[in-house]
Amino acid sequence: MFGKLNADNCELFPLVLSSCDKCSDLWQPFFMLLKKYWPQMDERIYLCTETKRCHFDGLDICSPLNMPAGSTWSENLIKLLQYVKEDYLVFMLDDFWLKAPVNIQLLERCQQIMRTNADVGFICLVPQLEPSVENPLSEEFPGLIEYGRQTPYRVTTQAGLWRKDYLQRILLSHESAWWFEMFGSKRSRRMPWRSFVVQTPVFRYDDGGVLYRGCYVSEYAKWFAENEGIELTPGRRMGSKRTLQQEQTEMGLLQKLHPRYVYEYVRSHI
């Protein structure tokens, strides 16, 4: 089904930045750090947010959406991908605030792997797991680990390279980002594309991003305020990651009792 592609006919890798209008306060810090730690970035940036627009000097930011209130994370991304002309993309979330220079050499190598191997659908650009029998070191692509078919979270919203048509195939319009990772990983088992993850990070940012369920992670956010001069949003709640995770665990137990949860759960398995 798949074969080698001619690298001379390849498309570029624009950045798709997944966000939402209520997180617009994250954009200026994100782009400031992007310019600082990835100054070579000169490709288009597609900002996936419901209605708002953003400008940052020196960056080509496109915000094409005008989504209705209540649209889901996946609905927004599905719609945005219709505007992306390129066949490949770099995907990031708005709270992945960079803390160190991007590993350009490794990024370009991963891009070349995807360009020239049509069965490579996703390469996660931050380490996620250690090599194992289920997730072996790739002999074909040294420095990469190949996700096993049964590995949980072989589809993730961590920073990564995507083949656009693969991403479009996995997305279901009713899902949140968290459900996309959970159930998209299961759907991906039935698809022919392979997924990989780097052993050495291309991007360096705090684990999971500077937010947790919409709240600043205090140990992360304060670092940026002190070391990068980032002005944090006064109205955005802040808490330790441990506290925020515990609250989410307790809330999640209640959510699973709601009929809507059961309905959406079934939809993700169809």
Briefly describe each language-model feature range:
Residues 1-69, 81-88:
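N-terminal anchoring/stem segment of glycosyltransferases
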Residues 1-12, 230-270:
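Membrane-proximal basic amphipathic "stem/tether" segments
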Residues 46-47, 89-91, 121-126, 161, ...:
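A structural signal for short, well-ordered beta-strand segments and their strand-loop junctions
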Residues 87-97:
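Short beta-strand-to-loop acidic/aromatic patch adjacent to the donor-nucleotide binding site
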Residues 101-130:
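Conserved donor-nucleotide/metal-binding helix-loop-beta segment in metal-dependent transferases, i.e.
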Residues 136-152:
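Short, flexible, basic/aromatic active-site loop/helix in glycosyltransferases
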Residues 154-219:
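Catalytic core and acceptor-binding pocket of nucleotide-sugar-dependent glycosyltransferases
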